[in-house]
Amino acid sequence: MEQEICVISFSGGQDSTTLAVWAKKRFKKVCLVGFDYAQKHSVELECAQKIASLLQLPYEIISLDFLENITRSALFKNSNDLMGHSHAQNKDLPNSFVPNRNAIFITLLHSYAQKIGASNIALGVSQADFSGYPDCKEDFIKSIEHALNLGSNTAIKILTPLMFLNKAQEFQMAKDLGVLDLVIKETHTCYQGERRILHAYGYGCGECPACQLRKKGYEEFQAKALFQ
């Protein structure tokens, strides 16, 4: 793998930052790609840019601001949907879910990988702590990998090394990679865009579903460390 190129879907969050460091140790070249899809807070993109610079990795942003016009999610900047409720289009999903977001991201990453000659795409998705998003599950990833390769006569691999790791295990992975401090202080997870309050697990409001999941994971990580 050391001679191969890997394209990473990069949001500047805990998952994709840990993934980027993992990939940097394994591939000759790593390219980070972020998406501006009219999410509520630009802080996500700002953190991604800073982390990319700290990791000395190339970073590009693809604009997808049209998504807000064709579907609904509490993550959109103009949305009035209240966080923590069911999705307006599907009561079985959280309203932070953006329908087909990962399918669109992966399709564009696949095109980009073909352009630069990359044989690998890496995603920070996990079905252990997946927030109720069906497009983070392994069966979806395998299906879209097969479909895109079939439709473009390619054999690009979609790697998901975090697929079966929970947040506590991801904190441990960051520690093992030597970037725990970076993950805590520089990555962004909070749905509310809060960057004024630094908790033990990182910046955030401490109340939104993303903060709660990250907080729980960090507490489990710390508890396990006490017995090692």
From Swiss-Prot:
InterPro entries (alphabetical): QueC, Rossmann-like_a/b/a_fold
Chain sites annotated for binding ATP: F10, S11, G12, G13, Q14, D15, S16, T17, T18, L19, A20
Swiss-Prot/TrEMBL catalytic activity: 7-carboxy-7-deazaguanine + NH4(+) + ATP = 7-cyano-7-deazaguanine + ADP + phosphate + H2O + H(+)
Top-level taxon of the source organism: Bacteria
Keyword ATP-binding part of the UniProt annotation: yes
UniProt keyword terms in alphabetical order: ATP-binding, Ligase, Metal-binding, Nucleotide-binding, Queuosine biosynthesis, Zinc
Cofactor list: Zn(2+)
Task performed by this protein: Catalyzes the ATP-dependent conversion of 7-carboxy-7-deazaguanine (CDG) to 7-cyano-7-deazaguanine (preQ(0)).
NCBIfam families noted in UniProt: 7-cyano-7-deazaguanine synthase QueC (TIGR00364)
HAMAP family: QueC
Family: Belongs to the QueC family.
Protein name: 7-cyano-7-deazaguanine synthase
Gene name for this UniProt entry: queC
